Amino acid sequence: VYGVDGGAEKGEFLKSLGATGYVDFTTTPNLIEKVKEITNGGADAVIVTAANPKAFVQAADMLVVGGTLSCVGIPSERGFLETPISSIVIKSLHITGNLVGSLKECLEAVDLVRRGIVKPKVTVRPFEDLPEIYKELERGEILGRIVLKIAKDE
């Protein structure tokens, strides 16, 4: 499993979660070629959680014949997959979308966390931080997930 994101801090974070390696798109001149190089010809599957539509097109180009593109993120602008149909057909790509998993998948995910196999990064912050959290999200500075605490401690 390789992670692709921007910045050294994100790379360290992904490796701490168990990624084999990391590619920083901000410092890699040809991201698609780099991924093909480290995966010996292309990835079997790419899961895109990015909000940038360009990430979806690049991901499709990183796949091997018969590869799977899993779209999880929803682009904030022009939400279209602008990959040539000929590429999808010739490479026999599988394209899936998933916003929320099934109950079974959610229970499996909770079990992985419970057994310590998956260690999510969760930061609890006060509800009053919400405007700043949005700014941090826009700048790509959030690692993991933020949980907003609404109730005051008594």
Regions found by a protein language model. Give the residues of each.
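Short amphipathic alpha-helical segments
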Residues: 15-16, 57-61, 82-84, 108-110
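Helix-to-beta-strand junctions that scaffold the AdoMet/dcAdoMet cofactor pocket
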Residues: 63-65
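Adenosine-nucleotide cofactor-binding segment
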Residues: 1-58
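Rossmann-fold dehydrogenase core element
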Residues: 67-70, 82-122
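Short glycine-rich anion-binding loops that position phosphate/pyrophosphate groups of nucleotides
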Residues: 52-53, 74-77, 153-154
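Short, glycine/polar-rich helix-capping loops at beta-to-alpha or helix-loop-helix junctions
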Residues: 5-13, 78-85, 106
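Residues in the short beta-alpha loop(s) of Rossmann-like NAD(P)-binding domains
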Residues: 7, 75, 101
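C-terminal hydrophobic helical "lid"/dimerization subdomain
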Residues: 57, 103-154
